[in-house]
């Protein structure tokens, strides 16, 4: 039997850090090797970031974009460990820096680590390809808890990208994210985004295909935060032995052709 993958947890005291630690309890294929927070943060069981990186084969990181970029660059400079990044809200410049780090180490980055959402992406891509833009409008709806700081969510953007891929277009050219006041009629082919923030909503996502006489809605609801933790752990186990590069959850699940 192979040895369990040694995992370090970034942002260990956060909601997702705690969820990852809980999800690792009792597993035979992965184990907590270290827990760490931001430099200067102290707490029981926490170690310095450099100590955590040295102890781990993979780091699971649900923190903030700037922290994830710094972590990726430090890991790349040291030749590892692998990273599983679940942070969202990156700028283009930050994504470029993660891409550069992925030339030296294995990085899995995804806006959502759930099986259901990744299945939903395929359904959205298929529906978008089958339903012509002149007859069917696409709207991505998402709702999250009031503490989430980025919008649209990383998952909503993934779903928008899937819809754009299905239609063979660039999402950046058709994305409509800010409706307020007199906006005029909707443009054919636009992919709209609607956002709700409130309470303790874990994550609700729907993609609406709206025609003149009928509509189709594809949806996913997160019941508990542990599903994201379990998916990230699956990714951390999957990276073992993989060559340096940038991967996503579609790779982990074998959904890519």
Curated annotation (Swiss-Prot):
Q: Tell me the InterPro entries matching this sequence.
A: DapB_C (IPR022663), DapB_N (IPR000846), DapB_N_CS (IPR022664), DHDPR_bac (IPR023940), NAD(P)-bd_dom_sf (IPR036291)
Cited Pfam families = DapB_C, DapB_N
This enzyme catalyses:
(S)-2,3,4,5-tetrahydrodipicolinate + NAD(+) + H2O = (2S,4S)-4-hydroxy-2,3,4,5-tetrahydrodipicolinate + NADH + H(+); (S)-2,3,4,5-tetrahydrodipicolinate + NADP(+) + H2O = (2S,4S)-4-hydroxy-2,3,4,5-tetrahydrodipicolinate + NADPH + H(+)
Q: What is the active site of this protein?
A: 144 (proton donor/acceptor), 148 (proton donor)
Which EC class does it fall in?
A: oxidoreductase
Q: Which GO terms describe its molecular function?
A: 4-hydroxy-tetrahydrodipicolinate reductase; NAD binding; NADP binding; oxidoreductase activity, acting on CH or CH2 groups, NAD or NADP as acceptor
Q: What is this protein called?
A: 4-hydroxy-tetrahydrodipicolinate reductase
Native organism: Caulobacter vibrioides (strain ATCC 19089 / CIP 103742 / CB 15)
| Gene name of the encoded protein | dapB
